[in-house]
């Protein structure tokens, strides 16, 4: 979110060893550079996250998944530069939309899914993968045939069967075995063009301009919300700012606590009141990713909050215009102004990414394997918040 009109799409392309992932990615990059020259595109390999001196590159334990999650988060937040564990660094432009292709064995682990714009699994049967393995490692790289076959049988194939193949069900698109590469390229290329069209549409129609300082504080809230999402928590987070200083922050804990009242705003308020008098809220501004609910809006009013900035509306429980306008009621406590639409599209997509995934802690868990993440974001109706 370094630039409020810049969008990042992260495409995870997973599959087993020698399934054709890298070849697909390289040809997709060529097509992107010719068909969308104004879009920045880059390929990242999961092997960049191998622990030093790893012996078995096929084992999940050989990869620094936590470091990988941090890089995914930085890309999602619009970082200008990312550095990988292998020592390489990548500069990301802030004046172009970005499509980042990532290929690797373990991209579709449950904790990584929220970061991807699209998830693809390249499937090939064991015989085809073995044939490619021999051709590449023996013929091209002059490897020892006996060792190559032993590695495939004792390391590569067991890892695929037990840990890689099961993640296939998390993919949005599965490219079937023996499929002609040109057909796969055409299909995935069109898919990327659709994603680009949505990125361009939302970036041009859903921008609400605010001062850079307000954007800085909201970015802090979004960083916490993205972390919450990766931990399967409702991605609503906030920061309270008093005279230019962040004095409190919070994120929803409704899932982990199984309590419907552990909202970001209330958690942050509790922490603030441990160190400051209640009178501090008269000069404090709240930045929250989603419109405060009825309960939180009322609490903010009782504390005489100075102002509230939020990203997207809360169509079911909003207390600042979407359902009720508690912030405007002057019958008991003073009213407070609200400023919606700060990183609106990003806030909408965070919530969609949460609700499209399985939530085993929901009161009535529902299977969501067939749900598709919608990318079109309608323009925000600002009139209801005036």
Curated annotation (Swiss-Prot):
Gene Ontology terms describing biological process: nucleobase-containing compound metabolic process; tRNA wobble adenosine to inosine editing
EC number of the protein: 3.5.4.33
Gene Ontology molecular function: ATP binding; deaminase activity; kinase activity; tRNA-specific adenosine-34 deaminase activity; zinc ion binding
GO cellular component: cytoplasm; nucleus; tRNA-specific adenosine-34 deaminase complex
Cofactor(s) required for function per UniProt: Zn(2+)
Domain of life: Eukaryota
Binding site for Zn(2+): 263, 293, 296
InterPro entries (alphabetical): APOBEC/CMP_deaminase_Zn-bd (IPR016192), CMP_dCMP_dom (IPR002125), Cytidine_deaminase-like (IPR016193), P-loop_NTPase (IPR027417), PRK/URK (IPR006083)
Catalytic activity, reaction form: adenosine(34) in tRNA + H2O + H(+) = inosine(34) in tRNA + NH4(+)
CMP/dCMP-type deaminase domain boundaries: 212-322
Keywords from the named record: Hydrolase, Metal-binding, tRNA processing, Zinc
Residues the record marks as active site: 265 (proton donor)
Function statement: Structural subunit of tRNA-specific adenosine deaminase, which deaminates adenosine-34 (the first, also called wobble position of the anticodon) to inosine in many tRNAs. Inosine-34 allows the decoding of 3 different nucleotides at the third position of mRNA codons, as inosine is able to pair with U, C, and A. The wobble inosine tRNA modification is essential for cell cycle progression in the G1/S and G2/M transitions in fission yeast.
Family label: Belongs to the cytidine and deoxycytidylate deaminase family. ADAT2 subfamily.
Quaternary data: Heterodimer with Tad3.
Name this polypeptide is given: tRNA-specific adenosine deaminase subunit tad2
UniProt source species: Schizosaccharomyces pombe (strain 972 / ATCC 24843)
């Amino acid at each position: 979110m370094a630039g409020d009109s810049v969008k990042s799409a992260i495409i995870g392309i997973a599959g087993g060893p020698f399934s054709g992932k890298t070849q697909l990615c390289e040809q997709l990059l060529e097509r992107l550079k010719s068909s969308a020259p104004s879009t920045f595109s880059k390929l990242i390999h999961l092997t960049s996250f191998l622990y030093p001196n790893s012996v078995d590159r096929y084992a999940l334990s050989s990869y620094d998944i936590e470091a990988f999650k941090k890089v995914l988060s930085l890309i999602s937040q619009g970082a200008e530069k990312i550095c990988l564990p292998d020592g390489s660094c990548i500069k990301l432009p802030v004046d172009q939309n970005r499509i980042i292709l990532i290929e690797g064995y373990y991209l579709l682990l449950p904790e990584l899914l929220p970061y991807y714009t699209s998830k693809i699994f390249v499937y090939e049967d064991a015989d085809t993968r073995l044939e490619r393995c021999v051709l590449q490692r023996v013929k091209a790289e002059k490897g020892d045939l006996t060792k190559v076959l032993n590695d495939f049988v004792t390391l590569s194939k067991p890892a695929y069967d037990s840990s890689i193949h099961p993640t296939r069900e998390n993919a949005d698109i599965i490219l079937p075995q023996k499929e002609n590469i040109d057909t796969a390229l055409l299909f995935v290329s069109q898919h990327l063009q659709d994603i680009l069209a949505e990125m361009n549409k939302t970036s041009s129609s859903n921008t609400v301009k605010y001062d850079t300082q307000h954007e800085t504080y909201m970015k802090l809230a979004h960083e916490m919300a993205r972390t919450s999402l990766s931990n399967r928590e409702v991605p609503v987070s906030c920061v309270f700012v008093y005279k230019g200083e962040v004095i409190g922050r919070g994120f929803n804990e409704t899932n982990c606590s199984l309590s419907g009242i552990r909202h970001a705003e209330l958690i942050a308020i509790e922490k603030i009141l441990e160190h400051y008098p209640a009178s501090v809220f008269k000069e404090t501004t709240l930045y929250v990713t989603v419109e405060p609910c009825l309960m939180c809006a009322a609490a903010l009013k009782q504390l005489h909050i100075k102002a509230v900035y939020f990203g997207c509306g809360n169509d079911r429980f909003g207390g600042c215009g979407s359902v009720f306008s508690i912030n405007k009621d002057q019958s008991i406590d003073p009213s407070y102004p609200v400023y919606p639409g700060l990183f609106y599209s990003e806030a909408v997509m965070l919530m969609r990414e949460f609700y499209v995934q399985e939530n085993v802690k929901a009161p009535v868990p529902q299977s969501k394997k067939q749900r598709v993440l919608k990318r079109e974001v309608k323009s925000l109706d600002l009139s209801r918040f005036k």
